[in-house]
């Protein structure tokens, strides 16, 4: 699995709009390009940070090269309208191969070790 981390600063008062647009866009990207989904977080400094999961780097690269364009033009316009700042060149903050995955770990009933 391959994970890509993105961040954005959102214009004050546009947070709900951004989140709706992000959800809609993420669903479209998964449907069209084969992404596995994403989680959106809010940093203490106010930035929104997304961790997007992909089956592999090649699948992500094809989507990235295609600029992840999707048909929901309204969602895309909402997203762009809400953005105040992006990283230089709109580049991902991190691109990582997953080595160990305990994200779905049930801490109430942990698996038994061998």
What are these regions, as identified by a protein language model?
Residues 16, 28, 37-38, 107:
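Polar low-complexity intrinsically disordered regions enriched in Ser/Thr and small residues
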Residues 9-20:
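Short, surface-exposed ligand-recognition loops at beta-strand->loop->(often short) alpha-helix junctions
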Residues 24-36, 53-95, 111-113:
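An amphipathic, aromatic/His-enriched active-site/gating alpha helix that lines ligand/cofactor pockets
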Residues 11-13, 57, 101:
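Generic structural motif
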Residues 2-9, 37-67, 108:
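Short, well-ordered beta-strand segments in beta-rich or mixed alpha/beta enzyme
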Residues 7, 94-100:
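Short amphipathic
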Residues 101-114:
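C-terminal/domain-terminus segments
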Residues 16-17, 42, 111-114:
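Short, low-complexity N-terminal intrinsically disordered segments enriched in polar/charged residues
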